From Swiss-Prot:
Residues forming coiled coils: 340-452
Composition-biased stretches (Pro residues): 127-143, 254-266
Keywords (A to Z) from UniProt: Coiled coil
KW Ion transport (keyword) present: no
Listed GO biological process terms: regulation of cytokinesis
Biased composition (Acidic residues): 84-112
PANTHER family noted in UniProt: ENDOSOME-ASSOCIATED TRAFFICKING REGULATOR 1 (PTHR31259), ENDOSOME-ASSOCIATED-TRAFFICKING REGULATOR 1 (PTHR31259:SF3)
Organism of provenance: Dictyostelium discoideum (Social amoeba)
Disordered: annotated segments: 16-148, 156-175, 216-351
Compositionally biased intervals (Polar residues): 236-252
Protein name per the record: Uncharacterized ENTR1 family protein
Length: 517
């Protein structure tokens, strides 16, 4: 069995409809920061008698275009949300299939290691610090560019006559169109933010996701703590509010600041609670804005009907002078530009949010894998702790038994020592008593010997016997010596007699020996 290898970043499938691409606004042009070397030429509005009425007619068209653009944006947001949910469901089914494959194949660890080595490592997101904007330097005077007047049509003359008769109606329509544009911009912004926040809440509320595919991801290095921005700085918030406010008309000396994209802070429990509360508030605001938009659309339709009736009634008045140029056309142009910018910014924000959601999903999967591994490590450590605790208890019991045995032995030795001490003391007492008795007996013997006369006579007799024995021994020694000398002299006489007898026996032989001369 071979495991399914899938791209972990395939949770988005962007839905593109050919019908909606035509109505989408073009992407915004990049805004350059002002420099001293660039000569900026800003076109100034020129009000002609012929163009005033064209501006009044284009306001209603702009409101309709803005309504269609916002509706298309909301459709796109809904389609991306539906596709996002479908991809999540497909991912869950695939995860269940892979769980079955993993149960059959537990020995395919090398493949997972290769997949892990092939995946890119995720780095912790860090918030870019807002760079200080350079101070604008004095610039040379800007040359205004004058736009050419368009040719006058027959319909324009009719509208001029209608405007002379219906100045009050036009003032009401301009105010309503401005309010409509503002409400549409705010509703578009709120719709983009609410969809993204709902997706974030769904990400962190899903607890039924499968974790088999997550083992393919690489470990995320959590050695560095991730910083969670609690609040947006005041400077950045002020620049954001100024950059997206459609009612602000920027001067020539201070060009509009570029839009600033701030990274989304990582979600915590406090942030999720705040997001839920903000979502409820945003939903209520969106409902109120939709109701206001419907009311404004009804008012616009009524005003258009009144204008048409007035045009039919005043076709004959063709030579009346045009009214003075009003500032409402300029405000409408600025509002239209701001609505286009806001829609383009909303699209960019949606794309950025989708990219960040993908990163956050990979982060969440990595963190879930780490949680699973940490749980396994925790269980192993707990089992080791239990084993070590059991060993400690057994060791403590052994030590307690050994200490008891040693204490018993020490107690017995102490008892024996005490008994030996008692015996030694008793023996010493007995020895002292015997010494005293011996001294007493000696004393008594001396006293008895001094007092008895018989003992004295016996002593004298012994002394006489000793002296007599000495005298007898000396006399016997002298007698023995004299006897030895006498015996020796007798032996010498015997020898001499033997020699003489031997000479006398050899005399006959000597006489018979002839003489030889």
């Amino acid at each position: 069995m071979s495991k399914k290898k899938e791209n972990p970043f395939s949770f988005f499938s962007y839905v593109k409809d050919e019908s909606d691409t035509s109505s989408l606004p073009p992407p915004p042009a990049p805004i350059h920061s002002p420099s001293s070397s660039d000569n900026i030429e800003i076109p100034l509005p020129v009000f002609n008698n012929n163009n005033n009425n064209n501006n009044t007619t284009t306001t209603n068209n702009n409101t309709n275009n803005s309504n269609t653009s916002t509706s298309n944006n909301s459709k796109n947001n809904r389609k991306t949300a539906i596709s996002f949910d479908d991809d999540d469901d497909d991912g869950d089914e695939e995860d269940e299939e892979e769980e079955d494959d993993d149960d059959d194949d537990d020995d395919d660890d090398d493949e997972t290691n290769n997949i892990k080595s092939s995946l890119p490592q995720l780095q912790p997101q860090t918030q870019p610090q807002p760079q200080p904007q350079p101070q604008p330097q004095p610039q040379p005077p800007i040359k205004p560019t004058i736009t050419k007047a368009t040719p006058i049509n027959k319909n324009v003359n009719k509208e001029i006559n209608n405007n002379n008769n219906n100045n009050n109606n036009n003032n009401n329509t301009t105010t309503t169109t401005i309010n409509n544009i503002n409400n549409i911009a705010t509703s578009a912004n709120n719709a983009g933010t609410t969809t993204s926040k709902k997706k974030l809440i769904q990400l962190f509320d899903d607890d039924d996701t499968n974790y088999d595919d997550e083992e393919k991801l690489e470990k995320f290095d959590r050695s560095t703590p991730m910083s969670l921005p609690k609040e947006i700085p005041k400077k950045v918030s002020s620049t954001l509010s100024n950059s997206f406010d459609p009612n602000i008309i920027h001067n020539q000396s201070s060009p509009p600041p570029p839009p600033i994209s701030i990274p989304i802070p990582l979600p915590t429990t406090d942030n999720l609670n705040n997001i839920n509360s903000n979502n409820n508030n945003n939903n209520n605001n969106n409902n109120n804005n939709n109701n206001n938009n419907n009311n404004n659309n009804n008012n616009n339709n009524n005003n258009n009907n009144n204008n048409n009736n007035n045009n039919n009634n005043n076709n004959n008045n063709s030579n009346i002078a045009p009214p003075p140029p009003s500032s409402s056309s300029m405000v409408n142009n600025v509002n239209n530009n701001s609505s286009d910018n806001s829609s383009s910014n909303n699209n960019e924000e949606n794309e950025n949010l989708k990219a960040e959601i993908t990163k956050l999903k990979t982060l969440i999967k990595g963190l879930k894998i780490q949680c699973i591994k940490y749980k396994g490590d925790k269980e192993l450590s707990e089992s080791k702790l239990l084993q070590s605790e059991n060993r400690l208890e057994q060791f403590k019991l052994k030590e307690a038994n050994e200490t008891k045995i040693m204490e018993d032995m020490v107690a017995q030795v102490e008892e024996n020592l005490n008994a030996m001490k008692k015996r030694a003391q008793y023996a010493e007492n007995q020895v002292e008593q015997m010494k005293q008795e011996i001294q007493q007996l000696r004393h008594q013997n001396q006293q008895n010997s001094m007092n008895n006369p018989e003992m004295q006579e016996l002593r004298y007799r012994l002394q006489d016997a000793k002296e007599k024995g000495r005298m007898v021994s000396q006399l016997l020694f002298q007698a023995s010596n004299d006897a030895d000398l006498n015996i020796k002299n007798l032996m010498r006489g015997i020898e001499t007699l033997q020699n003489v007898s031997a000479l006398l026996f050899s005399i006959d032989k000597i006489s018979t020996i002839p003489n030889q001369k």
